Amino acid sequence: MIDIILNDSGGTIMESLELRIFREVARTKSISKSAENMGYVQSNITAHIKKLERELNTTLFIRHSKGVTLTKDGEKLLYQAEKIISLLDKTLKSFQNHPKTLKIGTTQTIAGYLLPQCIIEYQKQFPNVLLSVSTLDQDDLEQKLSNGQLDCIITNNSHNICYGKQILNSPENLVLITPSSCHSQKDIWKYPVIINSIESCPYRKVLLGWWNLHQSELPKMIELDTVEAILNTVAMGGGISLLPQVVLLDKQNINSFYIESLQSTSIHMWVATDKLPSEYIALKDIIQKQLKIDNN
């Protein structure tokens, strides 16, 4: 990297490379030794020193048979060069140490069952990336993606997002969950339907749509805010619900039924239109791999 030092009027005075070469020559008192240390040919070192002397309109070194010695102006420049180079190096280091952030938006359900293992795996591969996960409803996710507050969103809503690029579309297995006392699909209809209180929730839409295809009367509905609340209520005999199969791992007092006529859902990953999709391929691959594991 070559840093440019400007004067007050914006004109170029010198490049930091010239200052670094000047400092090395001042330290070694030798053009040849400086060239060796910095990996340049001697003529290149000499050319940079002469260019610097022309820009400053002064002589910086006295040449003699044993090497070079700083002039008074050379000593003055060395003092300033040390400070300038130190400041440039600190500035560069501060940017290099500034952690890259990845701001992810998703639904509460996906954040709870899919992302934890994916985040662990991503951090193993990219330990210097700071991850931030926000759980929002679908409308808020799209809005924050469009205004730059999120880098990518992971959702199971299938409609297109005009200001995003889709890089993942992978199916998820859904199952109808019932209390353990429900041993047959014929018994399902006697239970209340437990759904997420957010109307845009895909599982809610699929479950109610399926119910309305098979029953003339609307179900008794219980609306809850969290997946955990839905699971606990089903386990205690309070009703039936629809959730991804993986959510049921190690859950007791719950039966599950796979019903072919239920409309499926998919996990979609969208990145903002001003982002490079290639930067998010690693996260996409991890999510896709985890979905394959979960769906088996």
Which sequence ranges carry the predicted segments?
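Short helix-boundary/capping micro-motifs
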Residues: R23-V41
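Secondary-structure junction motif
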Residues: P192-H214
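A late-sequence structural motif
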Residues: I259-N296
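Hydrophobic hinge/microswitch elements
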Residues: D137-Q138, N156, L208, L213-E260
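A short LG(V/I)-centered, amphipathic sequence patch enriched
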Residues: F22, E53-L70
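Alpha-helical linker/hinge and terminal dimerization helices associated
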Residues: E55-L56, L77-H98
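Acidic, Gly/Pro-rich loop/turn segments at junctions of secondary structure
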Residues: L136-Y191, V246-K251
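Central regulatory/effector-binding core of bacterial HTH transcription factors
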Residues: P99-I161, E223-L224
